[in-house]
């Protein structure tokens, strides 16, 4: 793993290469609350929490979800429970695109406000923030 060495008691940060663990992962749970959506994979501590800037593509349609309508994003993601990530792309500017085995795509990007749009929690305890 490429996780940075943290100060004592702090959470280690993951690098882009660490996100490869998502390729082949099965979406096993979608949790929705007022300000975000958590996607859980492989029934293990591998999650993506999304609070803003989610783009969902399916059957030729693209929908963009900001924080005001993030609950709608959660509803869309329910259709992918049981589906696997067939491809994952991540860039150094922290944009992530997950392609699912049914052809759907999820794109996550950091926003310009300085607040996090999403967080990936990896089984080793490290996090990737975008």
Roles of regions detected by a PLM:
Residues 1-130:
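Surface-exposed, interaction-prone regions used to assemble/regulate multi-protein complexes
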């Amino acid at each position: 793993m490429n996780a940075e060495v943290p100060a004592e008691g702090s959470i280690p940060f993951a690098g882009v290469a660490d996100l490869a663990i998502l390729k082949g992962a099965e979406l096993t749970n979608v949790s929705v609350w007022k300000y975000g959506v958590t996607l859980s994979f492989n029934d293990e501590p591998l999650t993506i929490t999304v609070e803003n800037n989610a783009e969902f593509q399916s059957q030729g349609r693209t929908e963009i979800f900001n924080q005001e309508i993030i609950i709608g994003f959660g509803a869309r993601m329910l259709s992918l429970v049981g589906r696997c990530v067939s491809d994952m792309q991540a860039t150094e500017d922290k944009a992530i695109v997950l392609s699912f085995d049914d052809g759907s795509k999820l794109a996550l990007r950091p926003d310009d406000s300085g607040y996090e749009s999403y967080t990936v929690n990896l089984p080793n305890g490290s996090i990737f923030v975008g």
